[in-house]
Amino acid sequence: MLDIQLLRKDLDGVAKRLADRGYTLDVAAFTALEAERRDTQTRTEEMQARRNSLSKQIGALKGKGEDTSAVMAEVSGIGDEMKASAARLDEIQKRLSDLLLGVPNLPHESVPLGKDETENVEVRRWGTPRQFEFEVKDHVDVGAPLGLDFETGAKLSGARFTMLRGQIARLHRALAQFMIDTHTQHHGYTEIYTPYIVNPEILYGTGQLPKFADDMFRVEKGGDENTVTQYLISTSEISLTNTVRDSILEADALPIKLTAHSPCFRSEAGSYGRDTRGLIRQHQFDKVEMVQIVAPETSYDALEQMVGHAETILQKLELPYRVITLCTGDMGFSAAKTYDLEVWVPAQNTYREISSCSNTESFQARRMQARYRNAQGKPELVHTLNGSGLAVGRTLVAVLENFQNADGSVTVPVALRPYLGGLERLELPAA
């Protein structure tokens, strides 16, 4: 959530920066609500002052032994008016809050201007795409004989669900374990096992609600009269980041670096017809997430560090990739700046997103009321960052395609072999 004081001080400037990312701020609605708030607040304060003055008069009259009934009646009437005015002020504040909950973050000054993904800026590349001496297969054709089972997944749960069997299941598990071990043993993260179901207010904290309710899977428990609505997490960023909600941390507790391997559940409401074949876009997929909670002055250094941590995974797996800075028009709702890592997918002859690393600055922290004591000992909002380290299913796609062999086998990347008992190749089952 944006700082409402910023809108009050520079509404036109905020509207311009939001327009850069393709969002039109309802300036008229905000201005009208602000005027109503100021008027109601002024009236409430005037009534408070009048009541205080009358209370002093009552004391003086009693001291003189004079009748106070008329003044006390006026005080009582003012009290009733103040209650109504306070209720009105609360209602206006809620409408302002609801308006702000739908407003995205402001882009950092270093973010390139652009309307959509075509105007993202490439930062660097690593690795050289392999030149194959045979016709390249996509991961579906490579993986199906090795245990990638789309038919059973669809039979059990419908489209965009997949079952992994045998060698493929082991490889998938090895990838996640390798990622977690790298982040905890070399990058300083603490591993967390997180709930996969959260309460609605948790999603407001990280920005999935109210705007992206259609992208979430909702679950209900209890009978008709006592139904409780909760949500399946679309990323463990949600639960990891909210561990500091409603907290005031000591400065020496920062930075906090957390990582988790979890399934993620997304309805993909806006992606009909996109990536319908294979593992690229699923309703359920695994991801290793990185989250950092830091002091504001260190957050952009932390962002670069986090990108480096995701890059390390790709480099150890020997997967070619590139780093992209997202332009203003392509960033996620909560982000002030985002880097995407895109891995080379041979069958598509292109790079595809495998990690997204974002600094949300104080946007999520303000919604969560996550603070720390600064050098002056005063509570100040932390900055929160999140990044994929990596999406496990998409990494599996990249391994199957980049390490495929002409005979249908797949060479296991060297970094993964200790997690597979030294296995060097996934072999086709004997006929």
Swiss-Prot record:
Instruction: Name the GO cellular-component terms.
Output: cytoplasm
Identification of the protein by name: Serine--tRNA ligase
Domain of life of the native organism: Bacteria
Q: State the family it belongs to.
A: Belongs to the class-II aminoacyl-tRNA synthetase family. Type-1 seryl-tRNA synthetase subfamily.
Q: Which organism is it from?
A: Paraburkholderia xenovorans (strain LB400)
The processes (GO biological process) annotated in the record are: selenocysteine biosynthetic process; seryl-tRNA aminoacylation
The protein's annotated catalytic reaction(s) are: tRNA(Ser) + L-serine + ATP = L-seryl-tRNA(Ser) + AMP + diphosphate + H(+); tRNA(Sec) + L-serine + ATP = L-seryl-tRNA(Sec) + AMP + diphosphate + H(+)
User: Quick one: which residues bind ATP?
Assistant: R266, S267, E268, E353, I354, S355, S356
Q: Where in the cell is it found?
A: Cytoplasm
Give the matching InterPro entries. Answer: aa-tRNA-synt_IIb (IPR002314), aa-tRNA-synth_II (IPR006195), aa-tRNA-synth_II/BPL/LPL (IPR045864), Ser-tRNA-ligase_type_1 (IPR002317), Ser-tRNA-synth_1_N (IPR015866), SerRS_1_N_sf (IPR042103), SerRS_core (IPR033729), tRNA-bd_arm (IPR010978)
Q: What is its EC number?
A: 6.1.1.11
Q: What does this protein do?
A: Catalyzes the attachment of serine to tRNA(Ser). Is also able to aminoacylate tRNA(Sec) with serine, to form the misacylated tRNA L-seryl-tRNA(Sec), which will be further converted into selenocysteinyl-tRNA(Sec).
The subunit structure is: Homodimer. The tRNA molecule binds across the dimer.
